[in-house]
């Protein structure tokens, strides 16, 4: 066992020199102390922290707790009064005894479970650990220690029935749902915790056989009534903490003494018979008082005890919350969210950990950006003039510049305006153009007037520019609308459609070179127009 583990065995004052040898079953690393509690250094003593450990002691004796541990328990440090703690100890041991009877466990297994229960709650608090779960874990662990194992499912079913009987309800079978699985996992964890806190020192020396042996020495073993009464007192003493205070020999003498006084059976007193077994009268009287207090106590409802524990848990949680920076009333310290509240605040909390910016304006800006991006995506995916904006035909040269569009888009955002160019196939000289489905006239296009100054030079380079005005008035057919000769008429009508459309809100200062190449290809591929002009 690791020294300083906080278990009952680690803080035990190992008294007496019990039998040690090949039959020893317990291994304890104990701090050897005197009656005053001061450590006694040995030849091979080891100092760990402020405690002096003598080493490893192999013994069959029970581990006894020092007086300061018995006086100030972890439950008292959690705010639980001693009377409530005593009632919880007695109730838990009664549950273990009743469950052992229903599970048909041997009495030694039930006694081991109750002793482990008492030891555990001298290292842990009733407020932080469920009494019922620890009781189940002790029954399951004791059944394996005493070589009479029981399934954990049977242990849960038995405790479930005992709870219904205690609450005077009709017993209902336990449903195997997720709650049952969680309870099973909690019991397994509780069993692990018991082993860890006790340092895996779970050996218990019981006084059952000692009582029979002492009565044989006193020649009273034939008095079955005396033997049975002494045995009963010993079983009742398991509900007290005498097994962590006194050695089993003293407990056996106290049970015989109490049974003989109850049945009025005389025992040798000159000298006193218990002195033969190494027990003092003070120890016997203290053990007898502990046992007799069980018969004078009032029966307490377990629900009342659980309600007290819940109140203590809430008090501890509130204390922890206040220690973490909450207000005295228990309300959390809020950040500076003046933009959120419509009313001004009268006063601010006195203690604030830090002035953090309010997350509300930042979140509002993020939401606005998301809405704007969503609107742009829906606008770009919607068909304009019968063509999806994301789809465009590229010129043969593979230029990255946007080509001149025969059907201008009416999108409100200039970033998403994309134009379509004439697409020519490499195998054939056929040309395809997407039809415009907008409200504008199909044969008239609104071009900005800025094209006259900076872009008309490219038109003049064309050999058919001087006939453009004459041919525009002469032909109104759809085939003639594809020529470049109507640029002047388009520029005349640009003002009228400029007011209606927002396509040329931001003027472009450079025309794509693919338009010039497309115009040369058009003149080369349609020689009929040039002959007609001649």
From Swiss-Prot:
Gene: CCNL1
Family per similarity comment: Belongs to the cyclin family. Cyclin L subfamily.
Pfam families in the cross-refs: Cyclin_C (PF02984), Cyclin_N (PF00134)
Function text: Involved in pre-mRNA splicing.
Main location, first listed in the record: nucleus
Biased composition (Basic residues): 468-485, 496-511
Source organism per UniProt: Gallus gallus
Localization per record: Nucleus speckle; Nucleus, Nucleoplasm
Compositionally biased residues, Low complexity: 400-412, 437-453
Domain writeup: Contains a RS region (arginine-serine dipeptide repeat) within the C-terminal domain which is the hallmark of the SR family of splicing factors. This region probably plays a role in protein-protein interactions.
GO CC term, one of those recorded: nucleus
Superkingdom classification of source: Eukaryota
RS: annotated span: 400-436
Protein name: Cyclin-L1
Listed GO biological process terms: regulation of transcription by RNA polymerase II
Region (Disordered), start-end ranges: 327-534
Cited InterPro entries: Cyclin-like_dom (IPR013763), Cyclin-like_sf (IPR036915), Cyclin/Ssn8 (IPR043198), Cyclin_C-dom (IPR004367), Cyclin_N (IPR006671)
Region listing for Cyclin-like 1, in residue ranges: 94-196
